[in-house]
Each structure stands twice: as structure tokens, then as C-alpha cells.
Amino acid sequence: MKISIKTVFLTALAILVIAQPVFAQENETTEHKHYQFTLEDCIRFAFANSYDRKSMELNTESQQVSYDQSRESRMPSVSASASENFSNNKNGSSFSGNANLGAAVVIYQGGNINKTIEQNRLSLERSNMQLQQYDDQLSVQILQSFLTALGYNELLHYQEVMLKSSREQMKQGRTRYKVGSILESDMLLLEAQYISDSSNIVETRIKLDNSILSLKVLLSMDPLDNLQIIQPNTDNLDDLAASLPTEEYAIEMAMETYPTLKLSQYDILLAENNISMAKTGYKPSITANASIGTGHIDFDNLGQQFSDRFSQSAGISLNIPIYSRGQTKASVKRSKIALEQAQLDYEQTQFDVRQTVSVAYHNVVSAYNSYKASELKENAYSKSYNAYEVQFQYGKITTVDLLQQQNNYLNVLNDFIQNKYSLVLQRKVLDIYMGKEITL
């Protein structure tokens, strides 16, 4: 059978038309999102998408359910039942039925119900504080990763400027070598410096990409999504030092708001409540109950039967614990030991928090001093390097002198950038200890 070229063409065209939606769908599935985030955006995104945080939120919801249910335990319980039976024997067959409605309520249980409600309320508040603690820890991790990426991004900018300068120096060196004004070794040094600067840029880009990837992990973001961080204004960091409170005030604020300390306080309250709950085992309990019911045998005069068989009952019961084989006594002792342990942990936590905040405070002071020293040094080396560039253009200094000054400037610049973002990190960490939100 002979197939025309036109038939082949139309068949191929039809296949392409049919396949186009499939290709489009595949393209849609491979598209990735693009984000431009400030630090605050990163923190909000992480709070909304962190799987660990969602798990903690579910635990808090479960605690809320337990608390709500325990409050309902003050109410009476009500139940109803109904049955219908059929029997058959040599004397004949018969039907019988019963219906009952009953209620029971705890009148007194040694305060156990109220203590259980209080226990669940404290557990709920503690769960919320655990969530706050997690948020603070996650915020610090995001801050550190974000600032690391900013540092590499800023360093990359300066390195690209230096690479442009190295490129011009290399071109000038080749020109001057051709006319015999410099040695071949000097020209090769300039070319080697250009290659070295290019390599530094590649390494910094790799470090920047890795820091962005680490940030994506903290944000629970798809690693294939595109994330660009927005550079905040960091031109004048003196305000960070100007707004620094006294060390005593920083410690005082941390003692009032720090989640780890709050959790220790809740542990003490829970332990105290556990003692009260354990002691209820010594006390009697009183419950009351009431019920109504009716029934029938066969279906003759059904209404009259319901009336005749209608019954009511009510009662009250008293349960007095006499001897529980030492279980209640042991429970009280264990609860008291747990309270002593909670109080000891609280004292240790107080000490740790004071030490931690004090160290954080002095880290800020040290970071600021390092930043100011490196800022002055960077300004001096920048001016010196610019002067060396001009002198090199006029042939007043050697290539070795120029490259030595350039490398010195790059080292000083790298220290300046590290000290700059270290100051921001240390200051914001102190803010978190003091219960403040992170902003840049």
C-alpha cells in the first residue's frame, strides 16, 4: 500500500495537536515558584509551612479538646435504653419490651474534677508556650541562615567589582608588556590574579547557593523553587548599639518573657496540682443517680401497660476509701518528689537564662567593637588600594605591590562583612531573649 507524503504530514500534525495538552501539562508540573523574601517574609513562610510546627499545633489542638472535655465533666451523664423481646414455647408466643432513661452526676469527688480541669488548662498553656519556644528557635536559625546568605551576596558584589578591575589591569598589563614597559613575569602575575579573582567568585557563588538551600530547608520550601532574599538597609548599624539597653534590663526582660523559663514555671504549677490530685484519693466521693422506665407484655392495652409499669427511682451513693494498699500514699510522695525536681530545674533554668543573656549581651558589645574597628580598617584599605591603582596606571609601583595591596584589601573587606553581619545576628538574638520580634 502506497502512503502519500501528505498523509504522513497530516498524521504527524494530528499527533502533535493531540500531544500538545500532555506536553503543556508536563510543563506545568515542572514549573517552580519564585519568591522574593525579606527576613520577616521568611519567618512567616516557615511558620505557615513547617511540618514540625504543624505537628505542635495539632498537639495544642488536642490539649484544647482535653481541656474542653474536662470542663464538661461537671455536667451529669444521661443515657437511654430500649429493648423488645420475642419468646415462643409450648404455651404460645409473647412479646415484651422495656424503655429506660437514666442520669447520674458526681456531687463530690474530693475536688478531683476541678483539679483535672486545672491540669488540662495548665497543659494547654504549656503547649502554647512550647510552640512559642519553637518559634523563637526557628527564628534564630532562619536569621542566621538569612544573614549568612546576605554576607555572601555582599561579598560577591565586591568580588565582581574587583574582577572588573583585575580584568582592566590584565589588559593594561598586556599592552604595557607589548611596548616593553613591564616584564613578562609582571604580566603573568596580573593574569594569574584575574584567574584567582574569577575562582573566588565561583567559590562565593557556591557558598551563596548552599546558604540559600539551607534557608529553604528551614522554610520547608521546595529546593527547586527560586528564592531571592531582599537586602535590608545595613548602611548605618550604629543604631543597634545606640538602642542597646543595659545588661540588667536585658536580663530582667528575659526573666519575664523567655519561653524556656516559662515552661519551667508551668512544670512547677503542674507538679503542685498533681499533689492535690493525688490527695483526692484520701477523700470520699458522692454520686447521685435517677431513672425512669416502663415496659409491656404483648400488645393488649399497650397504653395502660405503659402507665401501670411506669417506675421512677433515685439514689445516692457514698464511697469512702479506707485502705488502698499504700497506692494513694505512694502517689502523693511521687508527686512531691516531682515538685522538688521541678523547683530544682526552675532554679537551674533561671541561672542558665541569666548566664545566656549575659553572654549574649557581651557578644553584642564585642561584635560592635569588632565592627567599628573593621569599618575603619576597610575605609583605610579601600582608599589605599584606590591610590595604588592610580600609581600603577602611571607606572610608579610594581605589579607585586599592587597585587599585595589588593589581596590585603580583600582580606580586610571579608573581615568587615563578617563582623557587620555578626553584629546584626548577635543584636537580634538578644532581642529574641528579651521577647521582641525579629525585624531588619
Residue ranges of model-derived segments:
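A short glycine-centered flexible hinge/capping loop motif at secondary-structure junctions
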Residues: 177-181, 392-396, 433
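Hydrophobic, lipid-facing positions within transmembrane beta-strands of outer-membrane proteins
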Residues: 97-103, 250, 312-318
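Bacterial Sec-pathway N-terminal export signals of envelope proteins
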Residues: 24-79, 223, 229-269, 438
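C-terminal segment of classical bacterial N-terminal signal peptides
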Residues: 15-23
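Extended amphipathic coiled-coil alpha-helical segments
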Residues: 54-73, 114-175, 192-199, 206, ...
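Small/polar (Gly/Ser/Thr/Ala-rich) solvent-exposed segments
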Residues: 54, 77-94, 107-133, 262, ...
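Acidic, low-complexity, intrinsically disordered peripheral segments
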Residues: 2-6, 25-32, 40, 223, ...
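Periplasmic alpha-helical coiled-coil/stalk elements that build and connect Gram-negative outer-membrane
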Residues: 2, 7, 26, 137-253, ...
